[in-house]
């Protein structure tokens, strides 16, 4: 980071702001996650992640992704087998950290993907990456005919009382292992 114009005092300030433990991660872990998710400039985040993959995993991020994530054909297979596939964004951005224009581009790209795999693009569901959204996100979901938005608020939804664009959910980690 130091060679990319981010000083030690910046790092210290970032640590104070972002190293806040949550229900899943300790302070150090969440600090690294936040730096690589949205705090550092995107190009620097990508470079750090790529170097970490090569050093600790022994593969490039792209090679690892091919093993970890479903292929387009596998997603099409889910849809063809009757599974519902909704949106999680195109680039997995914290939507509340990007401009409304960038949000719209990301949502449209995601809808194009859903269309390509045969998933519905009217009355569709958005599961916000990291649970992050804002008023611009909600407006865009309505503009593009979404029916539901799912947050990371950890509780059971009350479909009669909760805003359909701000539904809570339980994470798999919320259940006994």
Task: Name these PLM-found stretches.
Residues 9-10, 22, 47, 80, ...:
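C-terminal active-site subregion of NodB/CE4 polysaccharide deacetylases
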Residues 15, 19, 35, 58-61, ...:
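A near-ubiquitous, low-amplitude feature marking generic local secondary-structure context
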Residues 53, 86-89, 124-130:
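Short beta-strand segments
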Residues 66, 91, 163-166:
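Glycine-rich, flexible loop/turn motifs
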Residues 71-75, 79-102:
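Histidine/lysine/aspartate-rich catalytic loop segments that bind and position anionic ligands
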């Amino acid at each position: 980071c130091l060679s990319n114009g981010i000083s030690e005092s910046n790092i210290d300030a970032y640590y104070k702001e972002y190293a806040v433990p949550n229900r899943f991660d300790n302070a150090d872990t969440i600090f690294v996650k936040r730096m690589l998710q949205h705090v550092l400039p995107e190009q620097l985040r990508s470079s750090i992640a790529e170097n970490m993959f090569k050093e600790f995993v022994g593969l490039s991020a792209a090679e690892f992704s091919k093993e970890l994530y479903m292929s387009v054909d596998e997603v099409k297979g889910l849809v063809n087998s009757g599974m519902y596939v909704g949106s999680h964004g195109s680039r997995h951005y914290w939507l509340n950290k990007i401009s409304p224009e960038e949000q719209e581009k990301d949502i449209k790209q995601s809808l194009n993907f859903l269309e390509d795999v045969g998933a519905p693009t009217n009355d569709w569901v958005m599961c916000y990456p990291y649970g992050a959204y804002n008023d611009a996100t909600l407006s865009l979901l309505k503009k593009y005919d979404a029916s539901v938005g799912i947050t990371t608020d950890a509780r059971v939804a009350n479909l009669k009382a909760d805003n359909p664009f701000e539904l809570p959910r339980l994470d798999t980690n919320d259940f006994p292992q």
